[in-house]
Regions:
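Acidic-aromatic/histidine active-site loop/patch
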Residues: 1-5, 167, 173, 177, ...
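Short coil/turn connectors at secondary-structure junctions
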Residues: 2-4, 31-34, 56-57, 81-82, ...
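Walker A/P-loop phosphate-binding motif and the immediately C-terminal alpha-helix
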Residues: 2-44, 220
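Conserved beta-strand scaffold positions in the cores of enzyme catalytic domains, especially
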Residues: 5, 37, 84-86, 175, ...
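P-loop/Walker-type NTP enzyme "switch/lid" segment
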Residues: 12, 40-116
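Amphipathic coiled-coil/heptad-repeat helices and related helical stalk/stem segments
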Residues: 21, 107-108, 130-131, 158, ...
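Conserved catalytic-core segment of NTP-binding enzymes
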Residues: 113-202
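C-terminal boundary of histidine-terminating zinc-finger modules
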Residues: 198-222
């Protein structure tokens, strides 16, 4: 069965954590799994950009107890055997501020546990840990992967976030370097490296086995979650780690 809850934790803003969470969920859905993606990055609200149509209830409403988590789930359109439901943050500043309280963080943690009981996997999109809801997200997750952009800024931020996760009793299990273009030096501490994905790239890429990034995402997903999805790719046949 493997791990049921995975948190991608950004080392910096703009590390690509949201896209990585969505692509990981899509990879799992291609393997036939039901996946929920929860946005704990209340300030940036990046997951909301992946939702088509109107967003009413959101992750902050769930955290405040104003809406059940069912009302804050939105389907991601996929060509896959499984499904992905997104729980985005999409709220005015006043509600964002209230949703960052310790009580709201505990409510969000309860909602994540509820989703873990109903879905095969839950993937959490977490900002650099500096607020209550981020702490709740990383402590409730079974596996935590730090996401670091391949840059000097990312390399500098990585030790700080590693230390912060240790301080709250939720150490990182892996490091994922993003934005790799093949021209610069590899991040030596990275367990997985993911190529640069342009902002204009189709969403998601992981469900198309012909894309170069799909097998890379599959390898990372299988390793982080301890599963064998049995995915196939055009060049390599049956995929295995």
């Amino acid at each position: 069965m493997g791990v049921s809850t995975l948190a991608f934790v950004g080392c910096t803003g703009g590390a690509g954590t949201t896209r990585l969470a969505v692509e990981t969920a899509a990879t799992l859905a291609r393997g036939g799994e039901r996946v929920a993606v929860v946005d704990a990055a209340f300030a940036t609200q990046g997951l909301a950009t992946y939702v088509e149509g109107r967003i009413d209830a959101d992750a902050t409403a769930v955290a405040l107890g104003d809406a059940p988590v069912d009302e804050a789930l939105y389907e991601l359109g996929l060509d896959a055997d499984g499904r992905v439901a997104l729980c985005p943050a999409h709220a005015p500043f006043e509600r964002l501020a209230r949703a960052k309280s310790s009580e709201s963080a505990q409510t969000l943690e309860t909602a994540v546990d509820e989703l873990a009981d109903r879905f095969d996997r839950v993937v959490l999109d977490v900002p650099p840990v500096a607020a209550n809801q981020a702490v709740a997200a990383v402590t409730t997750a079974e596996t935590r992967a730090l996401v670091v952009p391949e840059s000097e800024r990312g390399s500098d931020a990585l030790p700080r976030q590693q230390g912060r996760l240790r301080d709250i009793g939720a150490p990182a299990d892996a490091v994922v370097a993003t934005g790799i273009d093949g021209d610069g030096p590899a991040l030596s501490d990275a367990d997985h490296t993911v190529p640069h994905i342009g902002s204009d790239a189709p969403i998601p890429l992981a469900t198309d086995p012909d894309t170069a990034v799909a097998p890379i995402l599959a390898s990372m997903t299988e390793d982080l979650l301890g599963v064998d999805l049995g995915l196939t790719f055009e060049e390599s046949g049956l995929f295995s780690r």
